[in-house]
Structure formats: C-alpha cells, structure tokens
Design a protein with these regions (language model features):
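The feature captures the beta-strand-to-loop junction immediately N-terminal to the Walker
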Residues: 36-38
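Catalytic Walker B motif of ABC-type/P-loop ATPase nucleotide-binding domains
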Residues: 161-165
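C-terminal boundary and immediately downstream tail of ABC-type ATPase nucleotide-binding domains
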Residues: 124, 206, 212-217, 221, ...
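Helical segment within the ABC ATPase nucleotide-binding domain
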Residues: 176-190
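ABC ATPase C-loop
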Residues: 153-154
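Conserved ABC transporter NBD signature motif
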Residues: 59-68, 79, 113-119
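Helix-to-loop junction immediately C-terminal to a conserved catalytic motif
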Residues: 51
Length: 241
C-alpha cells in the first residue's frame, strides 16, 4: 500500500524566502508522526506546504501514491487531507452543529467508502461538543473551540489529518481531555496523523514516530518511544540550532 504521505527533497517557503530545505519523510497509512522543534524552525510551514499554502520550490509531495505538489488547496482537501491550523478558524456566528455539518463530505475522491464521520461519532469523541451543540462558535471556550476545529476536520472524512499545536494555550484539564481523545482517535480510526506540538513529551506519548526540525531541516527521525525514554537527548535535539 502507498504511504499516506511522502515528501522527498522538499524545498519551500514564502515567495523567494526559502524556509524548508531538503525535507524528506514518510507517514504510512494509520501512522502517526510528531513534529517537534523550537519556534521558528519550520514546523508550521511544513504543514502549510503539505496543504498548498506556501511557495513550492523543489521536491515532491505524494499523498496515497499521487503527487500533489501542483494541486490547489481545495483539491488536496478533496483527496482526503484534513487540516487543523493554529487559531482554530471556526465560524464564530454558526452553532457548533452547523460548524460540523457544513464540513461534512459524503465520499472521497480516492475511492474509499462514503461517510465514516458523522455528528454522532464526533459527539462520541468529544462529549462536550454534544452539550454545546446549539451554542455559537464564539460562545464556547478555547478548549471547546479546539475540539470543534478537530471535529470539523474529521467531518471531511480525511485519510491524513494535520494538526498544528492543538494543545497551545489550553488549561491542563482540557489538555488531558484532548490527549485522551487523540489517543482514542489514533487507536480506533483508519487515518494517519501529523501532529506539530510544542509540548514534546505529550506529543511523543500519542504518536509512533517523531521528527525533529532545526532551521528548516530534519535533524532526527525515529520512534517516539525512544525519544520519550531519553529526555536528555530529546532536550538536546529540541534546542538544537
């Protein structure tokens, strides 16, 4: 089977400014990858490039065996790439339920079955959203907005889910709830996940593989459990410049 995502020799940035240099990685179907590193090393740019929001300079991006670097953003989304950006970007004037239903897709372009994610499944994963289903997006807490952003991406029925710092700025009790939901999602659902996160140890706990970036390049790629078991090495890698 083809990998859910494969990058080779990736060079990208914003206009003529190059941020990512010679990035290569592979995420198998149902795989999970933590992307770690200090602020400003290219983690968010990596996700934005996969989605098509940056200037592509060289290399290749393949999703489920198909090269996508020349495709517009909406085509990448239709092929099964879901994106939870920083800032959540929910619709503040729509209710929780409206935010979810507006994102629902009934089939994928890649030939896999129709609806797998429904309102009921999202509410089962995030019970707090069921309780707030009739509240507008601007009437719920930051943690609930993050749950909504993830739920909305899932309603697109993705094969690959990109999440950019979903735990940022959240209270510890909400972080714990989100982590439990992510662990369940990775255990039960047939999708691959790339998780960009500043909370390195938390990200390593819920993923199988880890990638560390510095100055737009990959400086480490290996099993998450190995980094989690070696805090000293993790610290050296994450602060590497």
């Amino acid at each position: 089977m083809p990998d859910a995502l494969r990058l080779s020799g990736l060079r990208a940035g914003y206009g003529e400014t190059v941020i990512l240099e010679d990035v290569a990685l592979a995420v198998p179907e149902r795989g999970s990858l933590a992307v770690l590193g200090r602020n400003g090393v290219g983690k968010t740019t990596l996700l934005a490039t996969i989605m098509g929001h940056t200037t592509f300079h060289a290399g290749a991006i393949s999703a489920m065996g198909r090269e996508i670097q020349s495709l517009p953003v909406y085509e990448r989304n239709r092929l099964g790439i879901g994106y939870v950006p920083q800032g959540r970007e929910i619709f503040p004037s729509l209710t929780v339920e409206e935010n979810l239903t507006v994102a629902q897709k009934r089939k994928r372009r890649n030939g896999s079955p129709g609806v797998r994610w429904t309102l009921e499944r999202v509410y089962d994963l995030f019970p707090r959203l069921a309780e707030r289903r009739h509240h507008r997006g601007n009437q719920i807490s930051g943690g609930e907005q993050q749950m909504l952003a993830i739920g909305r991406a899932l309603m697109g029925n993705p094969t690959l889910l990109l999440m950019d710092e979903p735990l940022e700025g959240l209270a510890p009790i909400i972080v714990e709830a989100l982590l439990k939901s992510l662990e369940r999602l990775l255990a039960e659902d047939q999708l691959a996940v790339i998780l960009v996160e500043q909370h390195a140890k938390l990200a390593l706990q819920v993923t199988r593989e880890a990638l560390v970036m510095s100055r737009g390049r990959v400086i480490h790629h290996g099993p998450s459990r190995e980094l989690l078991a070696d805090p000293e090495r993790l610290g050296r890698l994450v602060v590497a410049q």
